[in-house]
Amino acid sequence: MSKQPSLSYKDAGVDIDAGEALVERIKSVAKRTKRPEVMGGLGGFGALCEIPAGYKQPVLVSGTDGVGTKLRLALNLNKHDTIGIDLVAMCVNDLVVCGAEPLFFLDYYATGKLNVDTAAQVVTGIGAGCELAGCSLVGGETAEMPGMYEGEDYDLAGFCVGVVEKAEIIDGSKVAAGDALLALPSSGPHSNGYSLIRKIIEVAGADIESIQLDGKPLTELLMAPTRIYVKPLLKLIKETGAVKAMAHITGGGLLDNIPRVLPEGAQAVVDVASWQRPAVFDWLQQQGNVAENEMHRVLNCGVGMVICVAQEHVEAALKVLREAGEQPWVIGQIATAAEGAAQVELKNLKAH
Protein backbone atom coordinates (compact mmCIF):
# COMPACT_ATOMS: atom_id res chain seq x y z
CA MET A 1 0.00 0.00 0.00
CA SER A 2 1.45 3.37 -1.04
CA LYS A 3 2.01 5.90 1.72
CA GLN A 4 1.51 8.70 -0.78
CA PRO A 5 -1.67 10.68 -0.02
CA SER A 6 -4.58 10.21 -2.43
CA LEU A 7 -4.84 13.42 -4.43
CA SER A 8 -8.13 14.89 -5.60
CA TYR A 9 -9.10 17.61 -8.06
CA LYS A 10 -9.84 19.81 -5.03
CA ASP A 11 -6.25 19.33 -3.83
CA ALA A 12 -5.17 20.68 -7.22
CA GLY A 13 -7.31 23.79 -6.71
CA VAL A 14 -10.46 22.87 -8.64
CA ASP A 15 -13.69 22.61 -6.66
CA ILE A 16 -16.27 20.67 -8.71
CA ASP A 17 -18.89 21.14 -5.97
CA ALA A 18 -18.50 24.93 -6.20
CA GLY A 19 -19.00 24.76 -9.96
CA GLU A 20 -22.17 22.71 -9.54
CA ALA A 21 -23.45 25.07 -6.84
CA LEU A 22 -22.98 27.99 -9.25
CA VAL A 23 -24.94 26.23 -12.01
CA GLU A 24 -27.84 25.67 -9.63
CA ARG A 25 -27.82 29.34 -8.61
CA ILE A 26 -27.86 30.66 -12.16
CA LYS A 27 -30.51 28.37 -13.64
CA SER A 28 -33.27 30.76 -12.57
CA VAL A 29 -31.35 33.67 -14.14
CA ALA A 30 -31.19 31.90 -17.50
CA LYS A 31 -34.86 30.90 -17.26
CA ARG A 32 -35.95 34.55 -16.94
CA THR A 33 -34.27 35.37 -20.27
CA LYS A 34 -35.72 32.49 -22.29
CA ARG A 35 -37.11 33.25 -25.74
CA PRO A 36 -39.67 30.89 -27.35
CA GLU A 37 -37.15 29.85 -30.04
CA VAL A 38 -34.73 28.39 -27.49
CA MET A 39 -35.05 24.62 -27.08
CA GLY A 40 -34.05 23.04 -23.76
CA GLY A 41 -32.41 24.57 -20.70
CA LEU A 42 -28.92 24.89 -19.23
CA GLY A 43 -26.73 21.82 -18.86
CA GLY A 44 -26.71 20.28 -22.33
CA PHE A 45 -23.59 19.96 -24.46
CA GLY A 46 -24.91 22.53 -26.92
CA ALA A 47 -27.72 25.10 -26.90
CA LEU A 48 -30.38 24.75 -29.60
CA CYS A 49 -32.27 27.71 -31.03
CA GLU A 50 -34.72 28.00 -33.91
CA ILE A 51 -34.77 31.00 -36.25
CA PRO A 52 -37.74 33.18 -35.21
CA ALA A 53 -40.84 32.90 -37.38
CA GLY A 54 -41.49 35.56 -40.02
CA TYR A 55 -38.04 35.83 -41.60
CA LYS A 56 -37.92 35.22 -45.38
CA GLN A 57 -34.14 35.18 -45.80
CA PRO A 58 -32.68 35.21 -42.28
CA VAL A 59 -29.01 36.10 -41.92
CA LEU A 60 -27.23 35.23 -38.68
CA VAL A 61 -24.95 37.86 -37.16
CA SER A 62 -22.39 36.98 -34.49
CA GLY A 63 -20.15 38.94 -32.18
CA THR A 64 -17.83 38.52 -29.23
CA ASP A 65 -16.35 41.00 -26.78
CA GLY A 66 -15.12 41.58 -23.25
CA VAL A 67 -15.19 44.52 -20.85
CA GLY A 68 -11.52 45.44 -20.94
CA THR A 69 -9.82 46.65 -17.79
CA LYS A 70 -13.08 47.98 -16.35
CA LEU A 71 -12.94 44.50 -14.84
CA ARG A 72 -9.83 45.47 -12.85
CA LEU A 73 -11.73 48.42 -11.40
CA ALA A 74 -14.67 46.13 -10.53
CA LEU A 75 -12.28 43.74 -8.76
CA ASN A 76 -10.56 46.57 -6.88
CA LEU A 77 -13.92 47.98 -5.75
CA ASN A 78 -15.40 44.51 -5.11
CA LYS A 79 -18.39 45.52 -7.26
CA HIS A 80 -19.54 42.68 -9.48
CA ASP A 81 -23.29 43.20 -9.90
CA THR A 82 -23.27 45.27 -13.11
CA ILE A 83 -20.16 44.14 -15.01
CA GLY A 84 -22.31 41.41 -16.60
CA ILE A 85 -24.58 44.11 -18.07
CA ASP A 86 -21.45 45.69 -19.59
CA LEU A 87 -20.52 42.35 -21.13
CA VAL A 88 -23.91 41.88 -22.81
CA ALA A 89 -24.03 45.51 -23.95
CA MET A 90 -20.64 45.33 -25.67
CA CYS A 91 -21.86 42.39 -27.75
CA VAL A 92 -25.50 43.22 -28.50
CA ASN A 93 -24.88 46.89 -29.36
CA ASP A 94 -22.41 45.71 -32.01
CA LEU A 95 -25.07 43.39 -33.47
CA VAL A 96 -27.92 45.87 -33.57
CA VAL A 97 -25.96 48.38 -35.68
CA CYS A 98 -26.49 46.17 -38.73
CA GLY A 99 -30.19 45.84 -37.94
CA ALA A 100 -29.97 42.49 -36.16
CA GLU A 101 -32.21 41.33 -33.34
CA PRO A 102 -30.07 39.51 -30.72
CA LEU A 103 -31.25 35.91 -30.20
CA PHE A 104 -28.94 34.26 -27.70
CA PHE A 105 -25.89 34.92 -25.57
CA LEU A 106 -23.16 32.79 -24.00
CA ASP A 107 -20.48 33.78 -21.51
CA TYR A 108 -17.00 32.58 -20.55
CA TYR A 109 -15.90 33.13 -16.94
CA ALA A 110 -12.34 32.13 -16.05
CA THR A 111 -10.84 32.40 -12.58
CA GLY A 112 -7.99 31.12 -10.43
CA LYS A 113 -10.32 30.17 -7.56
CA LEU A 114 -14.08 30.10 -8.03
CA ASN A 115 -15.94 32.35 -5.62
CA VAL A 116 -19.55 31.23 -6.10
CA ASP A 117 -21.06 34.45 -4.69
CA THR A 118 -18.97 36.67 -6.99
CA ALA A 119 -19.64 34.52 -10.05
CA ALA A 120 -23.38 34.44 -9.28
CA GLN A 121 -23.42 38.26 -9.07
CA VAL A 122 -21.67 38.50 -12.44
CA VAL A 123 -24.02 36.03 -14.12
CA THR A 124 -27.07 37.72 -12.59
CA GLY A 125 -25.84 40.92 -14.27
CA ILE A 126 -25.46 39.03 -17.55
CA GLY A 127 -29.07 37.87 -17.16
CA ALA A 128 -30.24 41.44 -16.53
CA GLY A 129 -28.39 42.56 -19.67
CA CYS A 130 -30.00 39.79 -21.71
CA GLU A 131 -33.44 40.87 -20.50
CA LEU A 132 -32.71 44.47 -21.53
CA ALA A 133 -31.59 43.23 -24.96
CA GLY A 134 -34.41 40.71 -25.41
CA CYS A 135 -32.03 37.77 -25.92
CA SER A 136 -31.65 34.42 -24.17
CA LEU A 137 -28.77 33.41 -21.93
CA VAL A 138 -28.40 29.85 -23.25
CA GLY A 139 -25.15 28.71 -21.68
CA GLY A 140 -21.55 29.43 -20.89
CA GLU A 141 -18.30 28.10 -19.52
CA THR A 142 -17.00 28.56 -15.99
CA ALA A 143 -13.33 27.65 -15.90
CA GLU A 144 -11.53 27.34 -12.56
CA MET A 145 -7.84 27.43 -13.47
CA PRO A 146 -5.45 27.51 -10.50
CA GLY A 147 -2.10 29.01 -11.36
CA MET A 148 -3.48 30.99 -14.31
CA TYR A 149 -5.06 33.89 -12.41
CA GLU A 150 -4.15 35.60 -9.15
CA GLY A 151 -6.45 34.38 -6.35
CA GLU A 152 -10.09 35.06 -7.08
CA ASP A 153 -9.38 37.43 -10.02
CA TYR A 154 -11.48 36.52 -13.04
CA ASP A 155 -11.82 37.33 -16.73
CA LEU A 156 -14.95 37.56 -18.83
CA ALA A 157 -15.90 37.15 -22.47
CA GLY A 158 -19.31 37.22 -24.12
CA PHE A 159 -20.63 35.76 -27.35
CA CYS A 160 -23.88 36.70 -29.05
CA VAL A 161 -25.81 35.61 -32.14
CA GLY A 162 -28.59 37.64 -33.74
CA VAL A 163 -30.71 37.54 -36.87
CA VAL A 164 -31.58 40.09 -39.56
CA GLU A 165 -33.64 39.93 -42.76
CA LYS A 166 -31.19 39.85 -45.68
CA ALA A 167 -32.96 42.67 -47.54
CA GLU A 168 -32.92 44.84 -44.41
CA ILE A 169 -29.24 44.64 -43.42
CA ILE A 170 -27.96 48.10 -42.47
CA ASP A 171 -24.44 48.50 -43.85
CA GLY A 172 -23.91 52.23 -44.46
CA SER A 173 -23.82 51.84 -48.25
CA LYS A 174 -26.74 54.30 -48.72
CA VAL A 175 -25.17 57.08 -46.62
CA ALA A 176 -25.03 60.30 -48.69
CA ALA A 177 -23.86 63.89 -48.32
CA GLY A 178 -26.47 65.96 -46.49
CA ASP A 179 -27.71 63.11 -44.28
CA ALA A 180 -28.17 63.89 -40.60
CA LEU A 181 -26.34 62.27 -37.69
CA LEU A 182 -28.27 61.64 -34.48
CA ALA A 183 -26.74 60.67 -31.15
CA LEU A 184 -27.86 58.71 -28.11
CA PRO A 185 -26.24 59.49 -24.74
CA SER A 186 -23.88 57.12 -22.96
CA SER A 187 -24.08 56.44 -19.22
CA GLY A 188 -20.38 57.26 -18.78
CA PRO A 189 -17.20 55.72 -20.19
CA HIS A 190 -19.13 52.45 -20.79
CA SER A 191 -16.47 49.70 -21.16
CA ASN A 192 -13.69 51.51 -22.99
CA GLY A 193 -10.65 53.55 -22.11
CA TYR A 194 -10.26 52.06 -18.64
CA SER A 195 -6.51 51.54 -18.93
CA LEU A 196 -6.21 55.31 -19.44
CA ILE A 197 -8.81 55.96 -16.71
CA ARG A 198 -6.94 53.77 -14.22
CA LYS A 199 -3.64 55.46 -15.14
CA ILE A 200 -5.19 58.90 -14.56
CA ILE A 201 -6.48 57.78 -11.14
CA GLU A 202 -3.04 56.39 -10.26
CA VAL A 203 -1.07 59.46 -11.41
CA ALA A 204 -3.52 61.87 -9.75
CA GLY A 205 -3.43 59.84 -6.53
CA ALA A 206 -7.20 60.24 -6.42
CA ASP A 207 -9.31 58.54 -3.77
CA ILE A 208 -12.20 57.78 -6.12
CA GLU A 209 -14.39 56.42 -3.32
CA SER A 210 -14.54 59.82 -1.61
CA ILE A 211 -14.94 62.08 -4.68
CA GLN A 212 -18.39 63.33 -5.73
CA LEU A 213 -19.28 64.82 -9.13
CA ASP A 214 -22.72 66.38 -9.70
CA GLY A 215 -23.81 64.84 -6.39
CA LYS A 216 -22.84 61.29 -7.35
CA PRO A 217 -19.87 59.23 -6.14
CA LEU A 218 -17.14 59.01 -8.77
CA THR A 219 -17.04 55.22 -8.34
CA GLU A 220 -20.72 55.07 -9.35
CA LEU A 221 -20.05 57.19 -12.45
CA LEU A 222 -17.07 55.06 -13.49
CA MET A 223 -18.87 51.76 -12.89
CA ALA A 224 -22.20 52.79 -14.47
CA PRO A 225 -23.11 49.89 -16.78
CA THR A 226 -22.84 50.30 -20.54
CA ARG A 227 -26.22 51.26 -21.98
CA ILE A 228 -28.05 48.68 -24.09
CA TYR A 229 -29.64 50.38 -27.10
CA VAL A 230 -31.22 47.32 -28.73
CA LYS A 231 -34.93 47.85 -28.08
CA PRO A 232 -35.09 51.60 -28.97
CA LEU A 233 -33.05 51.01 -32.14
CA LEU A 234 -35.08 48.00 -33.30
CA LYS A 235 -38.21 50.12 -32.74
CA LEU A 236 -36.67 52.95 -34.78
CA ILE A 237 -35.74 50.60 -37.63
CA LYS A 238 -39.17 48.93 -37.67
CA GLU A 239 -41.28 52.08 -37.40
CA THR A 240 -39.37 54.39 -39.75
CA GLY A 241 -37.29 52.21 -42.10
CA ALA A 242 -35.09 55.30 -42.27
CA VAL A 243 -31.83 54.14 -40.67
CA LYS A 244 -28.92 54.21 -43.13
CA ALA A 245 -26.07 53.47 -40.72
CA MET A 246 -25.33 53.17 -37.00
CA ALA A 247 -22.05 53.26 -35.10
CA HIS A 248 -21.59 51.89 -31.57
CA ILE A 249 -19.10 54.31 -29.97
CA THR A 250 -16.61 52.06 -28.18
CA GLY A 251 -12.79 52.01 -28.02
CA GLY A 252 -11.53 54.61 -30.48
CA GLY A 253 -14.37 57.02 -29.72
CA LEU A 254 -16.19 58.98 -32.41
CA LEU A 255 -13.02 59.31 -34.48
CA ASP A 256 -12.47 55.59 -35.05
CA ASN A 257 -15.99 54.15 -34.89
CA ILE A 258 -18.01 56.36 -37.24
CA PRO A 259 -15.68 55.62 -40.22
CA ARG A 260 -16.43 51.90 -39.83
CA VAL A 261 -19.90 52.48 -41.31
CA LEU A 262 -19.19 55.25 -43.84
CA PRO A 263 -18.85 54.62 -47.58
CA GLU A 264 -15.77 55.92 -49.39
CA GLY A 265 -15.87 59.64 -50.02
CA ALA A 266 -18.20 60.42 -47.09
CA GLN A 267 -17.18 62.52 -44.10
CA ALA A 268 -19.02 62.87 -40.79
CA VAL A 269 -18.98 66.43 -39.49
CA VAL A 270 -19.68 66.28 -35.76
CA ASP A 271 -20.49 69.36 -33.69
CA VAL A 272 -18.90 68.80 -30.29
CA ALA A 273 -20.83 71.81 -28.94
CA SER A 274 -24.16 70.04 -29.59
CA TRP A 275 -24.08 68.26 -26.24
CA GLN A 276 -22.99 68.87 -22.66
CA ARG A 277 -20.16 66.49 -21.87
CA PRO A 278 -20.81 64.58 -18.61
CA ALA A 279 -18.72 65.77 -15.66
CA VAL A 280 -16.83 62.47 -15.34
CA PHE A 281 -15.08 63.11 -18.67
CA ASP A 282 -14.09 66.66 -17.69
CA TRP A 283 -12.70 65.33 -14.40
CA LEU A 284 -10.65 62.68 -16.24
CA GLN A 285 -9.33 65.22 -18.74
CA GLN A 286 -8.36 67.68 -16.02
CA GLN A 287 -6.73 65.11 -13.72
CA GLY A 288 -4.78 63.48 -16.54
CA ASN A 289 -4.10 66.65 -18.56
CA VAL A 290 -5.44 64.71 -21.56
CA ALA A 291 -5.45 66.49 -24.94
CA GLU A 292 -8.92 67.16 -26.39
CA ASN A 293 -8.30 65.07 -29.51
CA GLU A 294 -7.04 62.18 -27.37
CA MET A 295 -10.25 62.34 -25.32
CA HIS A 296 -12.31 61.77 -28.47
CA ARG A 297 -9.96 59.08 -29.75
CA VAL A 298 -10.14 56.98 -26.57
CA LEU A 299 -13.41 57.78 -24.76
CA ASN A 300 -17.01 58.16 -25.94
CA CYS A 301 -17.25 61.58 -24.22
CA GLY A 302 -20.98 61.13 -23.59
CA VAL A 303 -22.06 59.62 -26.93
CA GLY A 304 -22.90 55.90 -26.97
CA MET A 305 -24.49 55.50 -30.39
CA VAL A 306 -24.58 57.51 -33.64
CA ILE A 307 -27.38 57.02 -36.18
CA CYS A 308 -27.48 58.26 -39.78
CA VAL A 309 -30.82 59.16 -41.42
CA ALA A 310 -31.84 61.39 -44.34
CA GLN A 311 -32.71 64.97 -43.34
CA GLU A 312 -36.42 64.43 -44.15
CA HIS A 313 -36.59 61.63 -41.56
CA VAL A 314 -34.92 63.49 -38.67
CA GLU A 315 -38.09 64.60 -36.86
CA ALA A 316 -39.78 61.20 -37.19
CA ALA A 317 -36.63 59.44 -35.93
CA LEU A 318 -36.26 61.78 -32.95
CA LYS A 319 -39.95 61.26 -32.09
CA VAL A 320 -39.71 57.44 -32.15
CA LEU A 321 -36.53 57.47 -30.06
CA ARG A 322 -38.08 59.81 -27.49
CA GLU A 323 -41.16 57.59 -27.28
CA ALA A 324 -38.78 54.69 -26.54
CA GLY A 325 -37.37 56.62 -23.57
CA GLU A 326 -34.22 57.92 -25.25
CA GLN A 327 -32.86 61.48 -25.23
CA PRO A 328 -31.56 61.84 -28.80
CA TRP A 329 -30.12 64.94 -30.42
CA VAL A 330 -28.70 65.98 -33.79
CA ILE A 331 -24.92 65.71 -33.50
CA GLY A 332 -23.90 66.57 -37.05
CA GLN A 333 -24.23 65.65 -40.70
CA ILE A 334 -22.58 63.90 -43.61
CA ALA A 335 -20.44 65.89 -46.05
CA THR A 336 -18.37 64.96 -49.08
CA ALA A 337 -14.82 64.30 -47.95
CA ALA A 338 -12.11 66.45 -49.50
CA GLU A 339 -9.10 64.66 -50.98
CA GLY A 340 -7.04 63.17 -48.14
CA ALA A 341 -9.39 64.48 -45.44
CA ALA A 342 -10.20 62.49 -42.31
CA GLN A 343 -13.55 60.67 -42.31
CA VAL A 344 -14.60 62.45 -39.12
CA GLU A 345 -14.27 66.18 -38.53
CA LEU A 346 -14.89 67.43 -35.01
CA LYS A 347 -16.20 71.01 -35.03
CA ASN A 348 -16.02 73.38 -32.05
CA LEU A 349 -13.40 71.37 -30.17
CA LYS A 350 -12.65 73.33 -27.03
CA ALA A 351 -9.10 74.52 -26.61
CA HIS A 352 -7.19 72.53 -24.04
UniProtKB/Swiss-Prot annotation:
The reaction(s) this protein catalyses: 2-formamido-N(1)-(5-O-phospho-beta-D-ribosyl)acetamidine + ATP = 5-amino-1-(5-phospho-beta-D-ribosyl)imidazole + ADP + phosphate + H(+)
Report the subcellular localization.
Cytoplasm
For this record, the Gene Ontology CC terms, alphabetical, are:
cytosol
Q: Which domain of life is it from?
A: Bacteria
Q: Which InterPro entries match?
A: PurM-like_C_dom, PurM-like_C_sf, PurM-like_N, PurM-like_N_sf, PurM_cligase
**Which terms under GO biological process does the entry name?**
'de novo' IMP biosynthetic process; adenine biosynthetic process
Q: Which family does it belong to?
A: Belongs to the AIR synthase family.
Q: Which organism is it from?
A: Pseudomonas savastanoi pv. phaseolicola (strain 1448A / Race 6)
Alphabetically, the GO molecular function entries are:
ATP binding; phosphoribosylamine-glycine ligase activity; phosphoribosylformylglycinamidine cyclo-ligase activity
Name this protein carries in UniProt: Phosphoribosylformylglycinamidine cyclo-ligase
UniProt keyword list: ATP-binding, Cytoplasm, Ligase, Nucleotide-binding, Purine biosynthesis
> Pathway it acts in?
Purine metabolism; IMP biosynthesis via de novo pathway; 5-amino-1-(5-phospho-D-ribosyl)imidazole from N(2)-formyl-N(1)-(5-phospho-D-ribosyl)glycinamide: step 2/2
Q: What is its main location?
A: cytoplasm
What EC number(s) does its UniProt record assign? Answer: 6.3.3.1
